[in-house]
A protein has these predicted regions:
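Acidic, small-polar-rich N-terminal luminal/periplasmic segments of exported/outer-membrane proteins
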Residues: 1-118
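Transmembrane beta-barrel architecture of outer-membrane proteins
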Residues: 20, 28, 52, 104, ...
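Short strand-loop junctions, especially beta-strand C-caps/beta-turns
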Residues: 23, 71, 126, 156-158, ...
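Short secondary-structure transition/capping segments
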Residues: 57-61, 162-164, 199-200
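Residues in well-ordered beta-strands of folded domains
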Residues: 58, 108-110, 124, 214-219
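Outer-membrane beta-barrel translocator/receptor signature
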Residues: 82-85, 96-174, 180-184
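Acidic/polar loop-and-plug regions of large Gram-negative outer-membrane beta-barrel proteins
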Residues: 156-160, 172-179, 183-236
């Protein structure tokens, strides 16, 4: 588990832990955090006002308990999965480790790092009946006896069952690993993210069900009600 900022055996983590690997993500066709959470006991998804990840840890809603390689990542957006080695979901008291504002759980994304001495690559593509599709690539190459470069990229079209809904996500993440000495490893990472989507907050409900006569109605201006994200993220 990497959520504690250093690799820790699962048996030594003082919370309940669920780990979803890159292989699991690819086999199940997960495209966002909400897809993973649906298969995790004790955790549910919340709407997030149609423009951000929102998770309910054991009954407590949170939009801030997200981490990236052990560092807080509480920006309000939908997180991509294309460059992840695994997703770690911790449930239980965590104020001592993650701050007194913790809700009783966190989600930590562990990114892929370059692998020295190996060359490999893969391309994945998918689509659904609503017209959505995604393409992702992962390529690792040795750049020397003690260094390697790895590049991950993806593009998503986010069409769904709502006729007026649309969205696009693009991500590019090169990483460099250098073995400085037997005791020192340097990992450098740059990530570019460009997201745009319509903010769909759903339709009104009555008696616990959506009001059918509103299912074709757009609540908001289709040209103005947009979420955009452009980010340049550097890690070392």
């Amino acid at each position: 588990v990497n959520a504690l900022k250093t690799p820790v055996p699962v048996i030594n983590v003082p919370q309940t832990v669920t780990i979803v690997t890159d292989e699991d993500i690819r086999k199940q066709g997960f495209r966002q955090i909400g897809d993973i959470v649906r298969y995790t006991p004790g955790v549910n998804t919340s709407q997030g006002e149609g423009h951000r990840d929102a998770v309910v840890f054991r009954g407590v809603r949170s939009t801030a308990d997200f981490y990236l390689d052990g560092m807080r990542d509480d920006v309000q957006y939908y997180r991509s999965l294309y460059n992840l080695e695994q997703v770690e979901i911790l449930r239980g008291p965590n104020a001592l480790l993650f701050g007194r504002g913790g809700t009783g759980g966190i989600i930590n994304r562990v990114t892929k790092k370059a692998t020295v001495g190996e060359v490999f690559g893969s391309v994945d593509a998918g689509f659904d009946s609503f017209g959505a599709f995604d393409v992702a690539g992962d390529y690792n190459m040795a750049t020397g006896n003690n260094s390697a470069l790895r590049i991950n990229f993806h593009t998503d079209d986010l069409a769904n069952h709502r006729d007026f809904y649309y969205g696009v996500r693009v991500g590019f993440n090169p990483t460099l690993k250098v073995l400085v000495s037997d005791a020192t490893t340097l990992d450098l990472s740059y990530e570019y993210a460009d997201h745009e989507r319509f903010i769909d907050r759903g339709i009104p409900t009555a008696d616990g069900e959506p009001v059918e006569r509103f299912e074709k109605i757009v609540f908001g201006d289709e040209d103005q009600k947009l979420q955009t994200l452009t980010a340049n993220i550097m890690r070392a």
